[in-house]
Curated annotation (Swiss-Prot):
Origin organism lineage: Bacteria, Pseudomonadati, Spirochaetota, Spirochaetia, Spirochaetales
Protein name, entry field: Uncharacterized lipoprotein TP_0456
Organism listed in the record: Treponema pallidum (strain Nichols)
Signal peptide interval: 1-20
A cellular-component GO term for this protein: plasma membrane
Membrane topology: Lipid-anchor
UniProt keyword Transmembrane, yes or no: no
Covalently attached lipid (N-palmitoyl cysteine), positions: C21
PROSITE patterns listed in its UniProt record: PROKAR_LIPOPROTEIN (PS51257)
Lipid-linked residues (S-diacylglycerol cysteine): C21
Keywords for this protein: Cell membrane, Lipoprotein, Membrane, Palmitate, Signal
Major location category of this protein: membrane
Length: 438
C-alpha cells in the first residue's frame, strides 16, 4: 500500500515535492518477541521469533531474486542505497487475491512463498546461490522493468452485486518514472496504467498521458478512488520548471477508451464519460487523508464500505502514535484510502506510517488488522474482540511496510530507509496464530 500519497499532497499547490513528509521509523526496542495482548490488557509472551522466516531481494542480470536470509541486523554500505522508485521492494498488496506487487519485478502470488516456508533458516548470509527450495526468481515484464510500480487498483463492484467484495481476476497497476532518480531512458510512449490478469499472468497497457493532452514526459504521481469518483495527479518537468495537472473521471474504463492518443469522446450508457481537468484545490479536497473520526453507517449507500471504514477508525483509535499516516484497503474499495491521526505535538515528534487491511470474509479468524512501520500489529478478530502483537524488532533505519495474510502466514515487507533512498529490502513470513492466538 502507498503511504507516499502524503508526499504528493505536500506538493499540491506548491509545484515542488517536499520531503519533510518522508517516512521515518519509530525507535524500536531491542526485544524481539511476539506479544499478543488481549482486550483485558493481559500479556502472554510467545517464544521469540520462533516462526519467523526472512527473505531478501536482490537483482542480477535483469532478474530479481528472493532468497532466504537471516534477520536484518547490519546496515548496508552507502553505495547499495538507491532511490525508492528504483529499489526492488514490496510496493503494494491485494489481500483478497493474495498478490504482492514487487517494484521493478512484477506480481508475486503470496502462495508461492509457501514452498519456501519449510526450508531451514540460514545462520549467515549465503555466499553462493541459494537452493531452489529457498529462493524464487522473477523476470520483470518489459512494462515494469524501467518504471516504478505503485499500487493495486480495481473497478468498483456495484453494491447490488451478489459478491460486492470479491476479486474480479484482474487488477490495475499505476506506473511512474521520476526523471530525477531514474537511470533508464524515459519512454514518452509508455502507459501510466496497466492491467494484470491474475489467471493468465499477462500484462496489457490501459492508459497513456498523451491521451490527456499532457506533455510527453508527464507522470502520474497519484491515483485514488473516493466517493464514487477517480482522481489523478500528473507531474511534468520542462527545463527547470515543474508543473502539475489534475483530473477526475468516473471509471478506469473511461481512460482505456481514450487509447494511446487523443480520440473523440466515447458515449457509455448514453452519456459521455471522459476525464476532465480539475483544480489543485479540488484534488486536495478529495484526496487529503481523512482525519480520525467515527462516521456512521448511514453516510452512504455502500453498507460494506461504511462498516469497513468503521473498522479502520476502530484500529486507528488504538494506536498510541501521532501524527500517524495510514493507508487502508478493503476488498470493497477500488483503491487504498488514506487516514491521518493527529494530536498536539512537539517540534521533535516525527510522523509515523501504518498500513491496514479489512478481510471480507474474515481471514485467519481476523476481520481487520493494522501494522505500524515499527512492527506493532493491532487487530480485530471475527468475534469482535481486539488484540495487539509485536513483530520482531528491526534495527535502526529499518521499517515494516505493507503486509497481507496468506494461509497460516502473515507476510510483511521490510526495508532499510535513509531519507528518499532504500538499502536492503525483503519479506518477513511468520505464523498468524503465534501473533494473534487465534
Amino acid at each position: 500500500m502507498n503511504t507516499r500519497l502524503a508526499l504528493v499532497l505536500c506538493a499540491v499547490g506548491s509545484g515542488v515535492l517536499s520531503f519533510s513528509c518522508a517516512r521515518t521509523a519509530e525507535p524500536t526496542p531491542a526485544a524481539s518477541t511476539h506479544v499478543p495482548v488481549t482486550t483485558a490488557g493481559a500479556l502472554s509472551v510467545t517464544p521469540p521469533s520462533s516462526t519467523d522466516r526472512w527473505y531478501q531481494f536482490s537483482r542480477t542480470d535483469g532478474r530479481v531474486h528472493l532468497r532466504a536470509c537471516p534477520a536484518p541486523s547490519q546496515p548496508s554500505a552507502p553505495e547499495h542505497f538507491v532511490p525508492w522508485t528504483e529499489a526492488v521492494r514490496l510496493s503494494a498488496v491485494d489481500a483478497q487475491q493474495e498478490l504482492l506487487l514487487i517494484n521493478r519485478a512484477g506480481v508475486l502470488p503470496a502462495t508461492q512463498l509457501a514452498r519456501m516456508q519449510t526450508a531451514p533458516v540460514p545462520r549467515k548470509a549465503p555466499s553462493t546461490p541459494a537452493a531452489e527450495t529457498t529462493s524464487l526468481t522473477l523476470t520483470p515484464p518489459a512494462l515494469l522493468a524501467t518504471q516504478s510500480a505503485e499500487g493495486f487498483y480495481s473497478e468498483p463492484i456495484p453494491n447490488s452485486s451478489p459478491h460486492p467484495c470479491q476479486g474480479t481476476g484482474a487488477v490495475f497497476v499505476r506506473l511512474y518514472t521520476d526523471p530525477l532518480f531514474t537511470t533508464s531512458p524515459q519512454d514518452s510512449a509508455a502507459p501510466f496504467l496497466v492491467r494484470y490478469d491474475v489467471r493468465t499472468a499477462r500484462w496489457t497497457s490501459v492508459a497513456y498521458t498523451r491521451a490527456l493532452g499532457l506533455p510527453r514526459n508527464a507522470q502520474c504521481t497519484a491515483l485514488t478512488h473516493t466517493r464514487g469518483t477517480w482522481y489523478a495527479s500528473f507531474k511534468s518537468s520542462e527545463a527547470e520548471r515543474v508543473s502539475f495537472a489534475y483530473f477526475s473521471f468516473p471509471s478506469l474504463s473511461s481512460l482505456e477508451n481514450l487509447g494511446p492518443t487523443q480520440r473523440r469522446e466515447h458515449p457509455i450508457g448514453g452519456k459521455v464519460q471522459v476525464p476532465r481537468p480539475i483544480s489543485a484545490a479540488a484534488f486536495r479536497a478529495a484526496c487529503t487523508p481523512q482525519r480520525l473520526h467515527l462516521p456512521t453507517a448511514s453516510t452512504s449507500s455502500d453498507h460494506h464500505s461504511d462498516l469497513h471504514e468503521l473498522l479502520v477508525h476502530r484500529l486507528l483509535a488504538r494506536v498510541p502514535l501521532s501524527p500517524l499516516y495510514l493507508s487502508a484497503r478493503s476488498p470493497c474499495w477500488a483503491s487504498d484510502r488514506s487516514f491521518l491521526k493527529t494530536a498536539h505535538r512537539t517540534a521533535d515528534e516525527r510522523a509515523h506510517h501504518a498500513n491496514a487491511l479489512i478481510f471480507h470474509p474474515p481471514r485467519a479468524r481476523l476481520s481487520a488488522a493494522l501494522l505500524t512501520d515499527s512492527g506493532h500489529l493491532y487487530f480485530v478478530r471475527e468475534d469482535g474482540s481486539e488484540g495487539h502483537a509485536r513483530l520482531s524488532a528491526l534495527p535502526p533505519q529499518f521499517v515494516y511496510t505493507s503486509f497481507t495474510l496468506s494461509g497460516p502466514s502473515l507476510i510483511a515487507g521490510w526495508e532499510e530507509q535513509d531519507f528518499f533512498q532504500v538499502g536492503s529490502t525483503g519479506l518477513l513470513c511468520t505464523e498468524v496464530e503465534s501473533l494473534t492466538g487465534t
